[in-house]
Amino acid sequence: MPQLNPNPWFFIMLLSWLTFSLIIQPKLLSFTPTNPPSNKTTTHTKTTPWTWPWT
């Protein structure tokens, strides 16, 4: 069964992970987010429960 032979597939997987880790990931992490996190506190609105007419 050729799919159980790890000879070509392990090398392809290893090469793809190394490509991702060494080339693609640093390029993606260098981008600045469009909405940086802020220290603003969130406001919670008080909601009233719905009154069901049949209860």
From Swiss-Prot:
It comes from the Eukaryota. Residues 37-55 have a biased composition (Low complexity). Residues 35-55 are annotated as: Disordered. One of its GO terms (biological process) is proton motive force-driven ATP synthesis. It is found in: Mitochondrion membrane. Signal peptide: none annotated. Keywords: ATP synthesis, CF(0), Hydrogen ion transport, Ion transport, Membrane, Mitochondrion, Transmembrane, Transmembrane helix, Transport. GO terms for molecular function: proton transmembrane transporter activity. It is a single-pass membrane protein. One of its GO terms (cellular component) is mitochondrial membrane. The chain crosses the membrane at residues 7-24. PANTHER family: ATP SYNTHASE PROTEIN 8. Belongs to the ATPase protein 8 family. Subunit 8, of the mitochondrial membrane ATP synthase complex (F(1)F(0) ATP synthase or Complex V) that produces ATP from ADP in the presence of a proton gradient across the membrane which is generated by electron transport complexes of the respiratory chain. ATP synthase complex consist of a soluble F(1) head domain - the catalytic core - and a membrane F(1) domain - the membrane proton channel. These two domains are linked by a central stalk rotating inside the F(1) region and a stationary peripheral stalk. Component of the ATP synthase complex composed at least of ATP5F1A/subunit alpha, ATP5F1B/subunit beta, ATP5MC1/subunit c (homooctomer), MT-ATP6/subunit a, MT-ATP8/subunit 8, ATP5ME/subunit e, ATP5MF/subunit f, ATP5MG/subunit g, ATP5MK/subunit k, ATP5MJ/subunit j, ATP5F1C/subunit gamma, ATP5F1D/subunit delta, ATP5F1E/subunit epsilon, ATP5PF/subunit F6, ATP5PB/subunit b, ATP5PD/subunit d, ATP5PO/subunit OSCP. This is ATP synthase F(0) complex subunit 8. It comes from Chaetura pelagica. The gene is MT-ATP8.
